[in-house]
Swiss-Prot record:
Upper taxonomic lineage: Bacteria, Pseudomonadati, Pseudomonadota, Gammaproteobacteria, Enterobacterales
Periplasmic side: 40-70, 123-124, 171-172, 243-252
Stretches of the chain found on the membrane's Cytoplasmic side: 1-18, 92-101, 146-149, 194-221, 274-278, 321-326
Identification of the protein by name: D-allose transport system permease protein AlsC
Single GO MF annotation: transmembrane transporter activity
Gene label: alsC
Source organism: Escherichia coli (strain K12)
Family label: Belongs to the binding-protein-dependent transport system permease family. AraH/RbsC subfamily.
Keyword list, A-Z: Cell inner membrane, Cell membrane, Membrane, Sugar transport, Transmembrane, Transmembrane helix, Transport
Amino acid sequence: MGFTTRVKSEASEKKPFNFALFWDKYGTFFILAIIVAIFGSLSPEYFLTTNNITQIFVQSSVTVLIGMGEFFAILVAGIDLSVGAILALSGMVTAKLMLAGVDPFLAAMIGGVLVGGALGAINGCLVNWTGLHPFIITLGTNAIFRGITLVISDANSVYGFSFDFVNFFAASVIGIPVPVIFSLIVALILWFLTTRMRLGRNIYALGGNKNSAFYSGIDVKFHILVVFIISGVCAGLAGVVSTARLGAAEPLAGMGFETYAIASAIIGGTSFFGGKGRIFSVVIGGLIIGTINNGLNILQVQTYYQLVVMGGLIIAAVALDRLISK
């Protein structure tokens, strides 16, 4: 009797509040709510309109896509600094294919995305072959891919391609803009990969400890290659969406977007030291970036200050992750 009573009393005792666990699950939502509340109070007549909120989701779609790709690179304690250049080159190839007569535009889109995947594969192969840190490799390929984009475009914008392509990404389905649906579908696929497939579990294990992953039978080089292919495909998809939204392929598109990609992943709770993160938290991280940019634009704050805010958020997010993990 006494034993039963003791067990019940111990089971009924409340566990102490675990801030680290709470923040890991709900931190990004908390940050987004605070930011929305701040801008909503500063400019309710513009910021809190249905049209503006829809625009935030649409504008965030590109950031969310490259952020999800960056998430995988960071998940294995790496980084991909070439996502902006891959975005530009994939978008340029998509536009060039349509101008060359590739029809329907879906075929040109697939071509652009495949280019993104191929560029990601180059990154992965170079990381595996040289043994250098992905920071060095992708810093170099960022310049190479950007240079190729400038060469094939003669440093000029490319436009005049399929109106159906532009109109497709300007349309909505049951009130939801196509770029938003596009991003959500990709997020669902990547969520399934990371939570329901062995490949995803292996990637997490690789990020946690490469040596342990190797000795447990995980093919480290193969998974690093896959990670960078995923990053490249996501950047390629972002390039397609960006080209459609702009109505032109810009050789300098995506300049500095690696900052947004990293910020989306880190603010979304992905550990910069690898092995921890959730894909839908990265989606919220991308929305946070989009909301901040939108709010600052409404308040007529110069773009330069937006970069200052992004840099500060990255430092704060990494510092908080380090503090919580101790």
